[in-house]
């Protein structure tokens, strides 16, 4: 898997965690090593309409996509649902959780469950979902799965991350 993170002013430790989260999440979502070795993820940290979005890269094969773009608007992630400012650690966790959510959509594209795009419309297992308003978005099967998996992916990742963090810190200190 090739992961490119395009960002400014993002801590190296968070970037490393984002790389690790990509591998962890796709593995937990049942994507084989063989398939994940052929995936390209371009993660852009920039202003966007939503906190996160993922889509098939314009140049990718739409029938068997392997190139994906994930956009994370980290500027929108500095406050919780109630408007409280997040600490740096909470902000990093929010970024990783949103990345996990978007990687569920990548899995859906890879397995053919989710097809189409913004212009053609999104299809879940062959059924087109026409959204009348934003409330309908949260009722789509692809969003229900992504919302349902995002927290579990974050917690599972953080358990592994905390276990390997001392060894990683030692490695970075010596190299």
Residue ranges and their predicted role:
Residues 48-94, 106-110:
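Active-site scaffold of zinc-dependent metalloenzymes
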Residues 106-122, 154-165:
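Substrate-binding/catalytic groove segments of enzymes
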Residues 97-110, 146:
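Active-site recognition of the HExxH zinc-binding catalytic motif
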Residues 14, 18, 92, 96, ...:
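Hydrophobic (often cysteine-bearing) scaffold residues that line and stabilize catalytic clefts
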Residues 2-69:
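Auxiliary, metal-adjacent structural segments of Zn-dependent hydrolase domains
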Residues 25-28, 107, 149, 153:
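Short alpha-helical scaffold segments that flank and stabilize functional sites
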Residues 132-175:
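Long, well-structured alpha-helical subdomains associated
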């Amino acid at each position: 898997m090739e992961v490119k993170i395009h960002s400014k002013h993002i801590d190296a430790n968070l970037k490393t965690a984002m790389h690790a989260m990509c591998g962890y999440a796709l593995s937990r979502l049942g994507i084989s090593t063989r398939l994940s070795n052929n995936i390209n993820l371009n993660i852009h940290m920039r202003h966007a309409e939503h906190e996160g979005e993922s889509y098939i890269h314009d140049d990718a094969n739409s029938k068997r996509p392997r190139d994906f773009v994930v956009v994370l608007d980290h500027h929108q992630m500095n406050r919780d649902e109630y408007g409280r400012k997040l600490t740096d650690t909470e902000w990093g966790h929010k970024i990783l959780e949103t990345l996990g959510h978007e990687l569920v959509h990548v899995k859906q594209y890879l397995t053919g469950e989710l097809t189409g795009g913004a212009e053609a419309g999104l299809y879940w297992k062959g059924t087109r979902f026409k959204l009348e308003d934003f409330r309908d978005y949260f009722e789509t099967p692809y969003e229900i799965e992504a919302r349902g998996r995002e927290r579990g992916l974050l917690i599972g990742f953080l358990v592994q991350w905390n276990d390997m963090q001392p060894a990683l810190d030692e490695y970075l200190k010596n190299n």
